[in-house]
């Protein structure tokens, strides 16, 4: 039986999965990008890419923090115009890098190419 992302993060401290959807294009591509997520251990910063789960639907969402609020984050997909207020407790992880299928190489969120994005 496959583990949930939360179980993977609790067990290993990180998880890998392929993205689905176009909300983070042009950075991440539908079914072509594989992201590396680490368990959230500290408050997120502006421009971090947060993984959160919407309690009403159980859907996982990977979007960028555009503003840090007191007990929440204002979050938006790179390819979206609407923003969502996400309570701190919904956030389960943060993207630390990704693999692009075409390039077949790892790009860290700390690297110059990512930082210039």
Question: What kind of region is each of these model predictions?
Answer:
Residues 1-117:
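Extended hydrophobic leader/signal-anchor segments used for secretion and membrane insertion
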